[in-house]
Amino acid sequence: MATFVMFGKYSVDAVKDISAERTQDATAVIGDAGGQVQAAYALLGETDLVLVVDFPGVNQAMQASVKLAQLLGISFTTSPAVTVEEFDDLVG
């Protein structure tokens, strides 16, 4: 599994529908794409949400990102991530 960080931004309409049920819906979309949420945070500022998610690969991360936008009205910027230790091994 590969780790991805998903940065979410609510649309005006999506803010009106925030609920624990929608959080469960988002988790289900990620699971349906083969992913697993490792951590989720609500933020203040330009980014409203950050999710740390494991997916089998880029295709599944992209699939979940698009489906989340379609279902919830939250746009995501999704980036692959590696630990600092993995990064050091890659560049060292």
Residue ranges and their predicted role:
Residues 37-40, 76-78:
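Generic structural signal for residues in well-ordered beta-strands
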Residues 55-82:
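An amphipathic, aromatic/His-enriched active-site/gating alpha helix that lines ligand/cofactor pockets
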Residues 13, 51, 77:
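Short, flexible active-site loop motifs that bind/organize anionic cofactors or intermediates
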Residues 5-9, 41-64:
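Short, well-ordered beta-strand segments in beta-rich or mixed alpha/beta enzyme
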Residues 1-32, 36, 44-47, 84-92:
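Short S/T/G/P-rich N-terminal loop/turn motif that feeds into the first structured element of a domain
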